[in-house]
A protein has these predicted regions:
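Cytosolic, long alpha-helical scaffolding segments
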Residues: 1-112
Length: 112
């Protein structure tokens, strides 16, 4: 359950930061949320790989591991929602749809 705890804490912080950025209309804080989402996605992928290995090693664990995977997927999705809030904050502040901008393009937009 270490992955669930780690990702859960990260996502909780992301959601809090996204809502704070929205409240303050702070695009820089929103950018940090978007950056954190990439880490959540990476951690989610690593956790899935670890769980695949565990299922291959011990078939009796498949049911409980699948439950963990569903929890992790839900947490990852919450992180995506926090990222969507952050994108809306930037849109409200700059009037630009940033959903498909690269990290470099987004940094340039907020710098200028």
């Amino acid at each position: 359950y270490a992955e669930i705890k780690m990702i859960g804490e990260r996502v909780s912080n992301m959601l809090r930061a996204a809502l704070d950025a929205f409240t303050r209309l702070d695009p820089q804080a929103a950018l940090e949320v978007k950056t954190e989402d990439k880490l959540v996605d990476k951690d989610f992928g690593v956790a899935l790989d670890n769980m695949r290995v565990l299922m291959a090693e011990d078939a009796s664990m498949i049911k409980s591991i699948l439950c963990e995977i569903w929890v992790l997927k839900a947490l990852e999705r919450i992180g995506d929602h926090a990222c969507n809030i952050a994108e809306q904050v930037i849109f409200l502040d700059r009037g630009v749809d940033v959903r498909h901008l690269s990290s470099a393009e987004l940094r340039d937009l907020l710098a200028g």
